[in-house]
Regions:
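Short coil-to-beta-strand
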Residues: 1-6, 57, 61
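N-terminal glycine-rich phosphate-binding loop and ensuing alpha1 helix
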Residues: 2-49
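Conserved acidic residues
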Residues: 3-4, 44, 65, 100, ...
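Cofactor-binding loop segments of dinucleotide-utilizing enzymes, especially the Rossmann-like FAD-
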Residues: 8-10, 51, 107, 136
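Short clusters of hydrophobic/aromatic residues that line enzyme substrate/ligand-binding pockets
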Residues: 16, 21, 67, 74, ...
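Residues at the C-termini of beta-strands that transition into short coil/loop
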Residues: 25, 70-71, 135
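Conserved N-terminal catalytic core of the sugar/cofactor nucleotidyltransferase
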Residues: 33-98
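Conserved beta-loop-beta/alpha segment of the NTase-like Rossmann-fold superfamily
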Residues: 74-147
Length: 147
């Protein structure tokens, strides 16, 4: 079974410019997602989908592949996660490389770990599911989580 991790890292954040490569505990925030994916040893390839040369350089320095820069249509404020994922999968399909499983990881997820990725893969296999998505219960109105 061929598996790919696709880490989404658009360069055009409006609220926090360059958020995907901002330092978080002395590391670029994207590095946590890349290292978790690589160290999980689940994936044949760890890809970063970005439209930004700076993000590309950082991603490659942590061992991810960036085979192309994302198109402008899939990098604008209205582009969806699904559109960006399909762009990567279609790129590989055009190279006659098909993946059986694709995992979407966001670049600004510094608390992701290889063990969480492995656990989610085990849930996927064990339950004969076609997707796994992390959620968390919050006991109060979510607005109370904000300052």
């Amino acid at each position: 079974m061929k598996k790919v991790a696709i880490i989404l890292a658009r360069g055009g954040s409006k609220r926090i410019p360059n958020k995907n490569i901002k330092s978080f505990l002395d590391q670029p925030i994207i590095s946590y997602s890349i290292r978790a994916a690589i160290s999980s040893q689940l994936f044949d390839e760890v890809i970063v989908s970005t439209d930004c040369e700076k993000i590309k350089k950082v991603a490659e320095s942590y061992g991810a592949k960036v085979p192309f820069l994302r198109s402008s249509i899939n990098s604008n404020d209205h582009a969806t996660t699904v559109d960006a994922l399909f762009e990567v999968l279609n790129f590989y399909k055009s190279k006659n490389k098909i993946f059986d499983l694709a995992t979407c990881i966001y670049a600004c997820a510094p608390f992701i770990t290889s063990s969480l990725l492995i656990k989610s893969y085990e849930i996927l296999k064990t339950n004969n599911s076609d997707s796994v998505f992390p959620v968390m219960a919050y006991s109060h109105p979510i607005q109370r989580a904000l300052k």
